[in-house]
């Protein structure tokens, strides 16, 4: 011990320093917790403010209306990051731990993965997939893609969900919206504004992922329009996919995806269309595969040869927008507007006038049908490959669903 140093005073000084350090750490913890809480509230609030609102009149989606014109705010990006990280964690457990996921990693899958990760700027990607259960998205994509991709919102897909399912409640709409899910009105046709809002995301060079059957089909076969209810004339699939492809100034790369087994995770009552269990099932096998990119050049060229040039829809470039704070007067369409660029460019403004110009002609609808049939052929080819590869293990209706069908004399159980 040093001479001249009072031990009691030394201990008192040490206690004071320790107490001060403890108080400082407690204050820092409170600041950290408060900051995290404030950030959380801010991100949730941002997601709430910018959520798609299909129930407004007219339907509103402010972020989609400005797609390609401005960057999303940091808070909105943070909200999306939180949603995709937590979603990836939860569905990775469901697909890879509680169930078995088998992926066919061939050249078509590797092409699909490369397009998701490093697609040339401005080139849109459109994936079309069969629909077996309410958790196909994000379940199948989380199973197919590495976590380093699914945790990056800027790389991930935009998709659509029926407004009466995903956007019925404000809280649900806020969550789905931050997860890059957009509303669609089933049965409202290809000219609805909600499809137009979704289409803007494709025009900006984004990745759009859709289920063109329009509903879940759990029997093992590609669904869509029932046999005898317009299927022979119009095909199985919805025509929205055809419209999105037909009018794009840069034809999107279209990749078909096909999966089996998801119906066993979330069985649906085939008579009432209600989910049979509140939580997904475990102990099942899910398979997934990607197909060859689909070409539509011959269909587009044939249409233009017979009916003239197709209208090509494009978003305004940032250089066409008036400077920040300008009320207008700059060259090009104001924010929220875009144009069909063809031999005679047609500007599509917002509001009712834009809805009128968005309407399709009879000849264009015929083209949409032909494109949708081409997509149908690709998905049926993948289904045939899956049946051949899986043989007797190819899944049909879930056991509970098959039992309900059998009880009501409608058969079922096999694909």
Regions flagged by a language model, labelled:
Residues 170-174, 206-207, 218-362:
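A cross-family acyltransferase "interaction/gating" segment
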Residues 121-129, 205-214, 252:
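Generic beta-sheet signal
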Residues 105-106, 188-192, 234-238, 361:
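A conditional alpha-helix N-cap/helix-loop micro-motif detector
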Residues 143, 188-196, 200, 239, ...:
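Short acidic (Asp/Glu) patches
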């Amino acid at each position: 011990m040093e001479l001249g140093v009072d031990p009691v005073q030394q201990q008192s000084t040490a206690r004071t320093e320790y107490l001060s350090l403890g108080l400082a750490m407690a204050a820092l913890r409170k600041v950290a917790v408060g900051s995290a809480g404030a950030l959380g509230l801010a991100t949730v609030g941002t997601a709430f403010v910018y959520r798609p609102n299909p129930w407004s009149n007219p339907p509103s989606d402010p972020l989609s209306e400005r797609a390609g014109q401005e960057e999303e705010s940091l808070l909105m990006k943070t909200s999306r990051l939180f949603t995709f990280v937590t979603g990836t964690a939860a569905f990775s457990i469901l697909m890879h731990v509680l169930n078995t996921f088998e992926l066919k990693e061939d050249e078509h899958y590797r092409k699909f993965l490369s397009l998701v990760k490093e697609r040339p700027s401005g080139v849109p990607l459109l994936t079309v997939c069969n629909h077996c259960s309410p958790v196909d998205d994000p379940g199948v994509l989380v199973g197919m893609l590495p976590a380093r991709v699914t945790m990056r919102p800027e790389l991930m897909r935009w998709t659509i969900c029926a407004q009466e399912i995903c956007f019925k409640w404000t809280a649900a709409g806020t969550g789905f919206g931050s997860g890059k899910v957009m509303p669609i009105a089933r049965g409202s046709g290809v000219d609805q504004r909600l499809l137009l809002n979704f289409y803007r995301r494709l025009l900006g060079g984004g990745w759009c992922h859709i289920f063109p059957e329009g509903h879940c089909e759990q029997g093992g076969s590609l669904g869509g329009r029932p046999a005898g209810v317009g299927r022979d004339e119009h095909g199985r699939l919805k025509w929205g996919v055809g419209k999105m492809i037909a009018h794009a100034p840069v034809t999107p790369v279209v990749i078909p995806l096909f999966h089996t087994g998801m119906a066993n995770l979330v069985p649906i009552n085939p008579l009432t269309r209600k989910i049979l269990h509140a939580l997904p099932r475990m102990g099942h096998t899910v398979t997934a595969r990607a197909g060859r990119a689909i070409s539509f050049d011959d269909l587009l060229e044939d249409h233009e040869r017979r009916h003239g040039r197709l209208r090509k829809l494009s978003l305004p470039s940032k250089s066409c927008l008036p400077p920040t704070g300008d009320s207008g007067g700059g060259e090009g369409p104001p924010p929220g507007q875009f144009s069909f660029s063809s031999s005679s460019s047609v500007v599509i403004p917002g509001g009712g006038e834009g809805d009128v110009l968005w309407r399709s002609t009879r000849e264009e609808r015929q083209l949409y049908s032909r494109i949708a049939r081409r997509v149908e052929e690709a998905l049926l080819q993948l289904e045939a490959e899956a049946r051949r590869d899986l043989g007797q293990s190819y899944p049909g209706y879930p056991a509970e669903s098959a039992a309900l069908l059998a009880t009501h004399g409608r058969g079922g159980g096999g694909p």
